[in-house]
Amino acid sequence: MSLFPDSNNSDCRSLFEDTKKSLYELAKNLEISSISNSFFTEIVIPLTSFFNSLEKRDHPYFICFTGGQGSGKTTLSEFVQLALQVGCKKRSVGFSIDDIYKTPEERESLAKSIHPLCKVRGVPGTHDVKLGLDILNSLVHAQASTLTLIPSFSKPLDRHYPKETWREYKGKPDFIFFDAWCGGARPVSTENWKPPMNTLEKEEDPNGIWSKWSNSELAGDYQILFEKFDLLLMIKVPNMEHVYESRWLQEQTLAKTLKDPEMKKKIMNKQEVFRFVMHYERLTRYILEEMPSFADIVVERDKVFNFSFLKTP
C-alpha cells in the first residue's frame, strides 16, 4: 500500500490549487459557512492524494467512512469524491447506509413480531443489506453502458423517495464510497454487554430484547457487506455526548435546507433528536472504544469541528 502523503508535499499543494474553487463551491451548496482552509489542505487533499495513489486495478476500490451521527462522514466523503473527480480525473460514486433502510411497512412488521422499537430506523436490523450488496455488485461488475440505480431516502418522510427520482450511475467507477454510522462495526461481545444504558433502554427495552436482536442482526449479513471494504476510515469524536449535540446541529442544518413547508413540519426538536440518538448509543459507545484499533484510517474530530489524523496507513 502507498505511503500516506504529507499535506505539505508538492503533489498535495498542486492538487489543492486544482480543486480549491470546486471544494468551496460545494461547501457553499452544503450550507457550510465556517469551513477552514486547513480542513481541505490537511484532511481532504491528503486523503484524496492517498486514494489516487492506490494501485490501479480492474475493479473499484470500496471505501467506508464511518462515524457517529453528525460526525461529518458524509460531508467528508463528498469533498473527497469531488477532489478525485476534479483534481485526479477519477470516477467515483457514493451512497449511504441511510439510503438502504427497510420500508416503514417492513419495520412495522418487525415491531409487531419482535419489539416495538424495531419500527425506528437506524440500528442494525432496520436496513435492507441485500439492496446494499446489489448496488455494490452492479457497480463492481458494470459495463460501460450499465446503469446502476442509487436509492435516495427522505429522513423527514421516513421513507425512500419514488424510484423514478433515484440517481442513475452509468458505467464502472474507480472508487465506491459508502458512509455508515456503524460501517465496519463488530457485534458487541457477551463479556462487553452492559445493562440498559439510557432512559430509552431502561423504560422501553429493560430485558434487552430489542438491543440483543439488533446485535444479532449486526453479526449476520452486515458483516458480509463490511468484509468487502478495501479501506475503513473512522471519524472519532470526543465522546457520546458530542454525538448527541452533533446530531442536533445536523437536524438544524437540515431544517435550513428544506423548502417544502410540509417537510419542515417533520423536523425534530432537540428533545426528539436526543431520544432518537438513544437508539444508537449502545453500539456507538462500543465503536468509539473498539474501532480505532482496527480501522485503517482514524480521523479525530474535536468539539469545535477541528479534524486531525490519529492513524494512517
Placement of each model-derived feature along the sequence:
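Extreme N-terminal, non-catalytic leader segments
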Residues: 1-64, 68
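Conserved NTP phosphate-binding and transfer environment spanning the P-loop NTPase/kinase superfamily
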Residues: 2-17, 40, 182-313
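Conserved nucleotide-sensing/catalytic segment adjacent to the nucleotide-binding pocket
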Residues: 35, 93-96, 100-158
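Conserved lysine of the Walker
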Residues: 73
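Post-Walker A helix-loop "phosphate-sensing" segment adjacent to the P-loop in P-loop NTPases
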Residues: 82-93
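Loop/turn-to-beta-strand initiation segments
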Residues: 145-146, 172-176, 231
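Switch II (G3) loop of P-loop NTPases
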Residues: 176-182
